[in-house]
Regions:
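H-loop/switch region of ABC-family ATPase nucleotide-binding domains
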Residues: 147-148
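Conserved ABC ATPase "signature" region
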Residues: 50, 65-83
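Helix-to-loop junction immediately C-terminal to a conserved catalytic motif
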Residues: 4
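Catalytic Walker B motif of ABC-type/P-loop ATPase nucleotide-binding domains
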Residues: 112-115
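H-loop (His-switch) and adjacent beta-strand-loop-beta switch element
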Residues: 159-173
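Conserved ABC transporter NBD signature motif
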Residues: 12-24
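Conserved ABC ATPase signature
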Residues: 87-91, 95
Length: 197
């Protein structure tokens, strides 16, 4: 959230390409957790995905035919074409997640932030999402995801950062994803859960 300028850093600053977030926001896309979204808001799948174009078009300008075509393409990439006119409140959890992934894709960003992109989705949806993320990586894009399923870290990611209040370890997954770093990260989990309850 600090990197996305949603909360202020305690100290220092966050830079992308040596620029502040406000200067490069059109190069950054964000997929939030499903739980942080009002799914009862009356809008369609197409409308939600099309909102991803507003950063390039401008909030007070009308989207062009090209923007609408790009919206259709993004919806197709996540396999949601038949749901294009469906209200988002009528979608399953996995379908909702794919809609927000499509909204990120239509932004044509360089960096993609994803907050628990696989949470609450079935294995088929998870596979389709990871296939899309791998394509982005192969296109030279950067994908940063919050992810807690230790079973899939090695399969899904090239780099890993372990955080427990502060950074425990960070680097290539084959070097950093070790039992020692996992233990350092999770050793006080039960204590912190008790403190937070």
């Amino acid at each position: 959230k600090t990197m996305l300028n949603l909360i202020k850093p305690v100290t220092g600053e966050v830079l992308f390409y040596n620029e502040k977030y406000s200067k490069v926001r059109n190069k950054i896309a964000y997929v939030p957790q499903r739980g942080s979204v009002d799914w009862d808001f009356p809008t369609t799948v197409f409308d939600v995905v099309e909102m991803g174009r507003y950063g390039k078009v401008g909030w007070l300008k009308r989207v062009s035919k090209i923007d609408k075509e790009k919206t259709k393409e993004a919806i197709a990439k996540v396999g949601m074409e038949e749901f294009s006119d469906r209200q988002i409140s009528q979608l399953s959890g996995g379908q909702q997640q794919r809609v927000f992934l499509a909204r990120a894709l239509v932004q044509e960003a360089e960096i993609y932030f994803m907050d628990e992109p696989f949470q609450g989705v079935d294995s088929k949806t998870e596979k389709s999402i990871i296939d899309i993320l791998k394509k982005l990586r192969n296109e030279g894009k950067t994908v940063i995801a919050v992810h807690h399923d230790l079973q899939t870290v090695k399969e899904y990611f090239d780099y890993v950062t372990f955080i427990n209040v502060s950074v425990v370890a960070s680097g290539p997954v084959e070097e950093i994803f070790t039992p020692e770093n996992i233990e350092k990260t999770y050793k006080n989990k039960k204590l912190s859960e008790r403190e937070g309850s």
